[in-house]
A protein has these predicted regions:
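Catalytic glycan-binding domains that act on GlcNAc-containing polysaccharides
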Residues: 1-152
Length: 152
C-alpha cells in the first residue's frame, strides 16, 4: 500500500518513498540507495521491492508469529481477509513490534477479532499509526471496489 502518495517524505525512522521503505530493506531487495540516487522514489522499482518484502519477510513472519501463539496457519487461512490485514501490520510495524502487540492483546483465536484487538492495542513501538494501518487498507479496498463497481 502506498503510504506517501503526494510527495517523497522521510519518516523519523528513515523510511522513504511512496512505500516508505527503510534503506537497508530497499537495498536487500535490489534498490540503489545513496546520497546521489534513491530508487525508493521510483514507483515501479519500489513496488517490486515492496512485493518481495511482503512475500519473503512479512508473510513468513506473520505465520511464525501466529504459530507461536498456537494458531495453525493453513492455505485457506492465508487467503482470509484477517490474515492479509495481519500481514500488513507486520509490513508496517515490523515483526518484533507486532509480536509485542500480540503478547499484550492475547487474542484467543485467529480471525477478525484478532485484528479488532490489534486496533486497540499499544505495545512497544506498535502505537497509533500501527493500529490504524489495516483500517487504512480496508478503506482503500472499499474505495477501489466502489469505483470498480460504479454504475452511473
Amino acid at each position: 500500500m502506498i503510504e506517501s502518495p503526494n510527495r517523497h517524505q522521510h519518516s523519523i525512522a528513515g523510511a522513504y518513498g511512496p512505500f516508505q521503505l527503510m534503506p537497508d530493506v530497499a537495498r536487500k531487495f535490489g534498490l540503489h540507495v545513496s546520497a546521489h540516487r534513491d530508487d525508493r522514489t521510483n514507483i515501479s522499482l519500489a513496488a517490486e521491492a515492496c512485493a518481495k518484502l511482503l512475500k519473503q519477510i512479512a508473510i513468513p513472519n506473520s505465520i511464525k508469529i501466529l504459530e507461536s501463539h498456537g494458531y495453525r496457519i493453513t492455505q485457506e487461512i492465508q487467503e482470509a481477509l484477517w490474515f492479509k490485514l495481519f500481514v500488513l501490520h507486520v509490513y508496517h510495524a515490523g515483526a518484533f513490534n507486532v509480536s509485542q502487540a500480540m503478547e499484550t492483546a492475547c487474542p484467543e483465536e485467529p480471525g477478525m477479532n484478532l485484528i479488532f484487538k490489534l486496533w486497540q492495542t499499544r505495545a512497544g513501538k506498535f502505537q497509533n499509526a500501527s493500529q490504524n494501518y489495516s483500517q487504512l487498507a480496508i478503506a482503500a479496498w472499499y474505495e477501489l471496489d466502489r469505483h470498480i463497481t460504479y454504475i452511473p
